[in-house]
Amino acid sequence: MKKYIVFLWVCLLSAGMQAVNPSGTLPIVYMTTNSGQAITDKENYVPGTVYIDPLSTGYAALGSSSAPLTAQLKGRGNWTWSGFDKKPYKIKFDAKQKVLGMPKNKHWVLIAGADDWLGYLKNPVGFMISKALGLRWTPGIVPVELVLNGNYQGLYFLTEHVRVDKNRVNIQEQEDLCTNADSITGGWMVEIDNYWSENNIEFNENNGQHVMVSLDVPEVLSNVQRDYIVHQIEALNNAIYGNSSATLEQILDIEEAAKFYLVQEIMEDCESYHGSCKLYKDRDSLGMVDKWKFGPVWDFGNAYDRHAERWIYDGPTWPQYWIGQLATWPVFQKAVKEQWWIYYHQYKDTIKQQAIDFANQLTEAAKLDAQVWEGTSNFRNNSNMADRRDDFIDRYNWRINWLYKQWGEGIQPEEKGEGVETNPTNIESRKILRNGQLYIMYKGQMYNVQGRRVEN
């Protein structure tokens, strides 16, 4: 009898530990570390290989089981790394690769989505809205299934890593420890952050809130670079809290800021100006000062969590730096309402359908993901994708309707000057520099570089 009980226990244990296999409905990323070494931290890369089998999804394969690509692998993320057993990863290929239809680069991330309880739709739809509104660059994101060292890990999202590159944030790259006065004016990418690091720039916002800004690039600063970036952040803060619209518009790209903000309001992301809030600046040239731009968007992990009929800066769960004050500026309000007009009339229904279609392709992989990770730390159950999808769509519709009550249909954007191009070649046009700003003269009229007519 004892032998029978032991045999039965072993059989049940073996059945419970039976490996889960990929659904076969999404591309499969096979990631293998040398000697099966575990990926245990975010700081140290582990050497390994990667190949991607697209199955019948229409994407091109990347490497193969017999010829995988060499890469360096490590963990990534903050709360998503420390708060969940399902871990996100960073991939650095030894050579630039075009991956699942996305432009060539060495650097990619595998987002785990373990913090997303709304059908894994928060980041993908946030990115969709950003692309629809035309922010200068939005990361590409493709759902995949991950096999790590031969073990199925569930549903992941292969995503372009945010970095300065001609195919990503396309600005002049600035070297570490640079001291050249012209070069240090651009190639900056910074982040309003909620995690401390020794290179952070810290200051008190004019409303008394303590703000930390981390530096993505450059990473190692000369004294000249640090003095410049500290002055720039102070100038941006002073302009936001100042009383001169002209000063604000000289340092901040208002249209890009409006687009970035509208994405956050539609997604009701109350942590959007608290962490992972990126800004970048290109190099000044031709006597023209390049403006700071909000973006690219990243991390919608808290989207729709509050579910309140309030602005994202009104009594938020976390401090929302700068945006509450920026939202008081008439020039910003007008730009936001113009972007809202575009979104409301052209994209609100399209994005909803794209979200539904995106969710539907995740159905089988989401079921298997739940089998792998149910019972682990902070598990979010998305096994019933139809319910999770519908909950997300209900919240999206609710937010669109609430914003309509605030803004109506918005303000139809002004038409740009007919026949005017940012870089015209017509012999009747010419560029002029006035008070440090670049303008275009066309048929006796003066336009700014966005193509809008200004007074001569």
Explain the meaning of each model-derived region.
Residues 20-125:
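Conserved NTP-binding catalytic cores of kinases and kinase-like/nucleotidyltransferase enzymes
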Residues 26-27, 37-39, 80, 84, ...:
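Middle-to-C-terminal accessory/interaction subdomains
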Residues 54-56, 183, 285, 350:
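Coil residues (strongly favoring Ser/Thr
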Residues 116-149:
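A conserved helix-loop-beta module that forms one wall/lid of the active-site cleft
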Residues 415-456:
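C-terminal outer-membrane/trafficking sorting elements
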